[in-house]
């Protein structure tokens, strides 16, 4: 179910403050955040946001196509290493 339009997008206040400061100072360093639940706003375009995936911060460059999505969608939390090889086949 999508979020109601009358509520508006959710962005953590501390993240919004960091982004506004980075835009005002034209800082190119990644903005480090743990807030995967925050929505990408148009003010974020052109910034690099380091989103925490549970282990490390993954740098995500924000483009106009990402607006409206959540930051957590761009920092994967699980790594798939493939299914284990079948033991019966290796007996040859």
Curated annotation (Swiss-Prot):
The keyword Disulfide bond does not apply. It holds the Pfam family Ribosomal_S19. GO terms for molecular function: rRNA binding; structural constituent of ribosome. One of its GO terms (biological process) is ribosomal small subunit assembly. InterPro entries: Ribosomal_uS19, Ribosomal_uS19_bac-type, Ribosomal_uS19_CS, Ribosomal_uS19_SF. The keyword RNA-binding applies. Keywords: Ribonucleoprotein, Ribosomal protein, RNA-binding, rRNA-binding. GO terms for cellular component: cytoplasm; small ribosomal subunit. Belongs to the universal ribosomal protein uS19 family. PANTHER family: RIBOSOMAL PROTEIN S19P FAMILY MEMBER, SMALL RIBOSOMAL SUBUNIT PROTEIN US19M. Protein S19 forms a complex with S13 that binds strongly to the 16S ribosomal RNA. This is Small ribosomal subunit protein uS19. It comes from Paracidovorax citrulli (strain AAC00-1). The gene is rpsS.
